Amino acid sequence: MAEDDMCSLFFKLKVEDVTCSDDPEKHMKNASNERKPLIEPVENQLMDIDDEGGSVDHGLLYLYVDCRTMMCCFHRGSLPYNWMQGALLTNLPPYQHDVTLDEVNRGLKQALGFFGYADPMRTPYFTAFSFPGRVIKLNEQMELTSTKGKCLKFDLYASTHLRFKPDELVRHGECKFAIG
């Protein structure tokens, strides 16, 4: 019962002006559009990336966990240790309508080797982050089967730096995967 109360608070949670998304697709696209001027150079503008070591922006990355873990992340300002080498994130958007939550759990369990993702209630919530230059793109990908039988591939990213800055948190909310 206490967890239900805590999860209802999750939807009212506001972290550094970031509120829960009731329409993740619209909010993710808006967030991406808001960030474009920050990461794309203006025409004829020179950029000196050598000083930064060639920082790469991977776009929005998503973390899928249960409500209690998500609340702890926000409270502590750190990512959960959900992988043997730190935190694992993906570019699978939480509004992917042709993938079921069970299939996402299967893909995460396979990618992470983490038994907790066998329970579909482990990933109904997402947090979207923007980590330019702070994550490593892994060689392997998460392979999912769509509701139409099509093979879909999503990139996986790792972060050993688990603390996050408030401005790296873009959105959070409940996933809108296909029901199946």
UniProtKB/Swiss-Prot annotation:
InterPro entries: Glyco_hydro_41 (IPR006065), Glycosidase (IPR006064). GO terms for molecular function: beta-glucosidase activity. GO terms for biological process: carbohydrate metabolic process; cytokinin biosynthetic process. Keywords: Cytokinin biosynthesis, Glycosidase, Hydrolase. It comes from the Eukaryota. It is an enzyme of class 3 (hydrolase). Its EC number is 3.2.1.-. Hydrolyzes cytokinin glucosides thus liberating free cytokinins. This is Cytokinin-beta-glucosidase 2. It comes from Linaria vulgaris (Toadflax).
